[in-house]
Amino acid sequence: MELFPSQPDLYLKISRRREEEQEKESQELQEQEVERRLGFQSKASDLDNKSSNNLIHTLQFTSNNEATKINSNQEHKESLDQDLRSIFMMRPIRGIPLYQNQVLDHYYYSSTSPNPFFFSEVNGQHASRRLITNPNCSFNLHNRHRRQAQPQPPRFTAKRGVRAPRMRWTTTLHAHFVHAVQLLGGHERATPKSVLELMDVQDLTLAHVKSHLQMYRTIKSTEKPTTSSGQSDCENGSQVNSEREARNLTGLWNNSSSEARFQLKAKASSGVDISSNENEWKNRRCPSNERLSSDSSSLTGTRPETETPNLDFTLATPNLSP
């Protein structure tokens, strides 16, 4: 008996049955794979169905709750729907929004209330968004509508205080201004409005007249002290000159009268005729009269006519002893 055959059996025993088994296994694997895929899809569809059912229930609940309130405020609800549509249709133009209030701020609620959500209905032609909220939404929307109805101040106000154009005060215009001020009783009584009405000049505003009148008043007030001081100086000088003139005149008349008295007394004592004494006194008086006239002309600037003094003297006759 041989332990090891001389030629080993190298033929593979491959039967058709083995191939069939492999095919069956592969088919089973494919079926399991398909079932697995179908299982995932069925689970997803179940979840979708559940979520859609929940959504439908919530919609029915909210619609039932809102139906009671919409019956009383149907017009108000329609206006709110129009506002919502206009919000989504609005777009800013060059960075400036068309609406002044941020209307979307009124739709946010506190953390305790459930968050609102949107859903879309697509029918191939139209897609619309609607806001689904809790019953508190109607109260907030009502407040928003009431705030929008109130009148609000404009956002962009016009510039205030437009500056008036500059006005050139010519000599003729200033003369016209001074004439109007004088007609109104002087710069202290004149008012800018009355001066403007009296002048009646084109393109002349109240601001122009007011500033010019203020400058005119300051100039007039500064000129007053200088003129008053000049007048007082002139008056003082005239008084001094008059006093000097009076002193000179009194001195001259006193000197001439004393000389005449002395001469008359001497002639009377010697027994000379009075008429000759008067002639001599007149001859001596001539240089004094000339000096008086020259002094008075230098003081006054004119040469006035000198008046002859009163020469009527009462001379007592001497008592001649026999």
Curated annotation (Swiss-Prot):
Coiled coil: none
Annotated S-S bridges: none
DNA-binding region: 192-217
Compositional bias annotation for Polar residues: 224-241, 299-322
One family name in Pfam for this protein: Myb_DNA-binding
A single MF term (Gene Ontology): transcription cis-regulatory region binding
Keywords linked to the UniProt accession: Developmental protein, Differentiation, DNA-binding, Nucleus, Transcription, Transcription regulation
Annotated function: Probable transcription factor that regulates lateral organ polarity. Plays a role in lateral root formation and development.
Protein name: Probable transcription factor KAN3
Organism: Arabidopsis thaliana (Mouse-ear cress)
